[in-house]
UniProtKB/Swiss-Prot annotation:
Its cofactor is pyridoxal 5'-phosphate. Pathway: Amino-acid biosynthesis; L-histidine biosynthesis; L-histidine from 5-phospho-alpha-D-ribose 1-diphosphate: step 7/9. The keyword Transferase applies. GO terms for biological process: L-histidine biosynthetic process. InterPro entries: Aminotransferase_I/II_large, HisP_aminotrans, HistidinolP_aminotransfase, PyrdxlP-dep_Trfase, PyrdxlP-dep_Trfase_major, PyrdxlP-dep_Trfase_small. It catalyses: L-histidinol phosphate + 2-oxoglutarate = 3-(imidazol-4-yl)-2-oxopropyl phosphate + L-glutamate. This is Histidinol-phosphate aminotransferase. Homodimer.
């Protein structure tokens, strides 16, 4: 095949590796019952009001959706004290991340980010011929001092995932305020708050809308995939200045949020009961995993997301594989070059107990050859 057929940027791009699908594990290992604790999904399932909204709307799928998702934007605006002009909706948070890069990055522009964070930041920047400037975590957190030191005339964006995926911890109000004050106004700060609804119960979690109010060159990213439980229909959104939203709208697909997704997202916004139950269960599941780690002297990162990052003291790959054989799917840390760590999504109490039991059997009873 002709070597110059494809764009040069593709040579450095790596496809995103999602968590293993349940069906694939069932087929590979011949297991019927699988507990998927790999992709940070809602163990309670979708919001019932989202399901009802989809069922009402399904008879209209012959009609194109509202290209502007105006009703959804207006409902989000009410809850954030913004206007619909401050909001961009997308086909999941991933599309918003792509839109950000497409809006801001020129060839040679730099974007600062952590080495252990959501991988699509780097991919989206590379795709636009930008230059990712990648710094290691410091004390398991974004190295904010290092970020500031790396700012130069080519810096266009700084990405902050808060809580950070896959680690799960947060930057505090004090840390965020001190950082934002040192970033020049012409640098765009992207605050990825995919796990916002879990984190906001922590009084130390910063209010990103205050950041946006003080500096317009801020983009806040949120999603309906997590507490809303509608990851399968794909809806995310950005809160930003009217000017930035206007520019982002120029590069988005016309009908980028389908009619069922818009209905589902509106249902989630109304379903406070489902959200409250989800958050409550989340911290109960985290508590069970914390207790196990403490009783077994396993290091873990205090999480304000719907997953835990823990050091199992041995390489994660054989543990990951053995857990799959026993019907549990998690994310092995070697994917992020954290060889001895695993990321485990929160689940129902039964799922969490099953995971703990299987992990304990592997680590303490030699079920796998962990080396």
């Amino acid at each position: 095949m002709t070597t110059n057929l494809f764009r040069k940027e593709l040579e450095v791009l790596k496809p995103y590796v999602p968590g293993k699908p349940i069906e694939e594990v069932q087929k590979e290992y011949g297991i019927d019952q699988i507990e998927k604790l790999a992709s940070n999904e809602n163990p309670l399932g979708p919001s019932p009001k989202a399901v009802e909204a989809i069922m009402r709307e399904v008879q209209h799928i012959n009609i194109y959706p509202d290209a502007y998702a105006m009703k959804l934007k207006e409902e989000i605006a009410k809850r954030t004290n913004l206007t619909h002009e401050n909001i961009i909706t997308g086909n999941g948070g991933e599309q918003i991340i792509q839109l950000i890069a497409q809006t801001f990055i020129n060839p040679g522009d730099e974007a600062i980010m952590a080495d252990t964070t959501f991988g699509l930041y780097e991919t989206s920047v590379l795709n636009m011929k930008g230059v990712p400037v990648i710094l290691p975590l410091k004390d398991y957190k974004h190295d904010l001092d290092g970020f500031v030191e790396k700012i130069n005339e080519n810096t266009k964006i700084i990405y902050i995932c808060n809580p950070n995926n896959p680690v799960g911890n947060i930057l505090s109000k004090e840390e965020m305020e001190g950082f934002v004050a040192r970033v020049p106004e012409n640098v765009v700060i992207v605050l990825d708050e995919a796990y916002y609804d879990y984190a906001k119960v922590n009084p130390e979690y910063p209010e990103s809308l205050d950041v946006l109010a003080k500096r317009p060159n801020t983009v806040i990213l949120r999603t309906f995939s997590k507490v809303g439980g509608i990851a399968g229909v794909r809806v995310g959104y950005a809160l930003t200045s009217k000017e930035i939203a206007s520019q982002m709208s120029k590069v988005k697909d016309v009908f980028n949020v389908n009619i069922l997704a818009q209905a589902a997202a509106l249902g989630v916004l109304e379903d406070t009961e489902h959200i409250e139950k989800t958050v409550k269960l989340n911290y109960e599941s985290l508590g069970m995993m914390e207790k196990y780690c403490e009783e077994n002297d396993l290091e873990y990162i205090k999480s304000n997301a719907n997953f835990m990052f823990m050091n199992i003291g041995t390489h994660s790959k054989p543990v990951f594989e053995e857990l799959m054989k026993q019907g549990i799917i998690i994310r092995p840390g070697f994917l992020w070059k954290w060889d001895n760590w695993i990321r485990v999504s929160t689940g129902t109490l039964e799922q969490t107990e099953k995971f703990i039991d299987k992990l304990d059997g592997i680590l303490n009873k030699g079920t796998c050859c962990c080396g």
